């Protein structure tokens, strides 16, 4: 009986040791997992916070100078046709310097489009807090914008007013400029606000009737 008791005691002690080791291993695993998870999440947040600035820096590296183009000379015979007869360099989603989804929009991208000679500037317009803003989306839906931020319509038009018609910021500043708005909203208020902003920023640039 004493032998059986000793064997049973030894068995229980061994089980307790294994259980304790197992608990320690589980604890170590959980702590390591939490540390790794925090590190990965911190790295993700850091990269996302820098993404807006990175997009602008990347554009500066790619487009570091004016292209070899200039404004049209209306006296040249090749420039006497109708507007419809020309190909016009166009920038799609002109405030987007990265992806259309899970990214940022910035006026630095708009400035680069102007600097590179785009004379048709495209924008996707949304209504946020009853104000017209510029954003992007990868889906065709009035109610979904997929960027982390937005650019106010007023800021974008101010950039155009200050950059698109100056020889120091546009290589073809004397060429006609077309603005293409894809308005993703049924909010009538923003239409009036857009009209007021255009009148304020670009009234002296509008082609006469």
Where is each model-derived feature located?
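Long, acidic (Asp/Glu-rich), low-complexity accessory segments flanking structured domains
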Residues: 2-120, 126-209
